Amino acid sequence: MVHMHITAWALGLILFFVAYSLYSAGRKGKGVHMGLRLMYIIIIVTGFMLYMSIVKTATGSMHMWYGLKMLTGILVIGGMEMVLVKMSKNKPTGAVWGLFIVALVAVFYLGLKLPIGWKVF
């Protein structure tokens, strides 16, 4: 399940940047954007399944940290969607990019710091 979740995130980020480049070039990126929305659903479902499997075995404050990581992941998805919608409507995206970057860094940090992630930190 972890590999499916990571693969969904990788595909989601790739589709996000492809849709962003299409919108910034003035082309229609609606099809890629819809594919990205499908990836959002897969990311949320696999993340929730991972969270539920962790709840069964986690001890101490691990529930809180994984819950925080799940909420931060939803913020990343929200930031991605807001950037693309504002780009498609030719509105400024500066603040939304800030939200997206901060949430992405936080979710990567939590993902690498917590026990299921890689042992980088």
Swiss-Prot record:
The chain crosses the membrane at residues 6-26, 38-58, 65-85, 92-112. GO terms for cellular component: plasma membrane. Keywords: Cell membrane, Membrane, Transmembrane, Transmembrane helix. It is found in: Cell membrane. It is a multi-pass membrane protein. It comes from the Bacteria. Belongs to the UPF0344 family. HAMAP family: UPF0344 (MF_01536). This is UPF0344 protein BCG9842_B4136.
